């Protein structure tokens, strides 16, 4: 089993944490990143998003893409310890909270930190350190220098 994706991605880290909790063995490839895609990555995920999981080396054409799908696969592969509740209402709520974290929270953090700071620095540009006027909290990004 091979997990692909940049270690700074919160979605990759989510899959890594679930794999660790499930005590799953896997190979890790950090190369796929929005800053540079391996030549063959589009065959694995045509959308070029991370993480991606290749569950079986003997089936290179089968990939699971999206952190929630990967975590659900891990849950079925190794049911214990259970990371999702078994009761229907609690399970539905857990899936909803996961979706809120994946879409709303990740988008806000990405807009405030990853895009203006890490992506700029990785591309050799200065970090864009300014108060974000769209932030409802008036969050300021603190200067990061290497």
Residue locations for each model-derived region?
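GST-like domain detector, emphasizing the conserved glutathione-binding G-site
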Residues: 1-130
């Amino acid at each position: 089993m091979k997990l692909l994706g940049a270690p700074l991605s919160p979605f990759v880290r989510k899959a890594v944490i679930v794999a660790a909790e499930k005590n799953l063995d896997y190979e890790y490839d950090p190369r796929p990143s929005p800053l540079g895609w391996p030549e063959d990555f589009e065959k694995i995920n045509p959308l070029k998003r991370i993480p991606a999981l290749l569950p079986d080396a003997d089936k290179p054409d089968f990939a699971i893409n999206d952190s929630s799908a990967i975590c659900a696969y891990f849950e079925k592969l190794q049911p214990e310890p259970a990371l999702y509740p078994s009761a229907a209402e609690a399970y539905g709520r857990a899936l909803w909270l996961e979706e809120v974290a994946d879409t709303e929270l990740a988008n806000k953090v990405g807009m405030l930190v990853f895009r203006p700071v890490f992506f700029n620095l990785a591309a050799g540009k200065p970090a864009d350190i300014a108060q974000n006027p769209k932030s409802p909290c008036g969050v300021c990004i603190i200067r990061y220098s290497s």
